[in-house]
């Protein structure tokens, strides 16, 4: 895990492997504690690259963009 303090919050970068995909997560936390997340991953079965966006306060992806 990599964590960096910014002027208006913090950013945390972690890697993950959930069995279906592996990639990284970038989590931004503002000074009020609100979090937003972008995950960049590759599906293991198809090799499809994705960007998954979670808006502040959302547990489910708000958008999934296929990159290839």
Language-model segments: which ranges?
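Short intrinsically disordered terminal tails
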Residues: 1-2, 66-68
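Residue-level signal for functionally critical sites in structured catalytic/ligand-binding pockets
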Residues: 12, 40, 67
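Acidic, low-complexity, intrinsically disordered interaction modules
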Residues: 16-61
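Negatively charged, low-complexity tracts enriched in Asp/Glu with abundant Ser/Thr
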Residues: 2-14, 19
């Amino acid at each position: 895990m990599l964590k960096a303090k910014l002027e208006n919050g913090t950013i945390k970068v972690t890697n993950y492997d959930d069995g279906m995909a592996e990639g990284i997560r970038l989590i931004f936390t503002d000074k009020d504690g609100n979090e937003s997340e972008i995950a960049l991953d590759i599906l293991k079965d198809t090799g499809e690259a994705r960007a998954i966006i979670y808006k502040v306060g959302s547990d489910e992806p708000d958008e999934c963009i296929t990159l290839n």
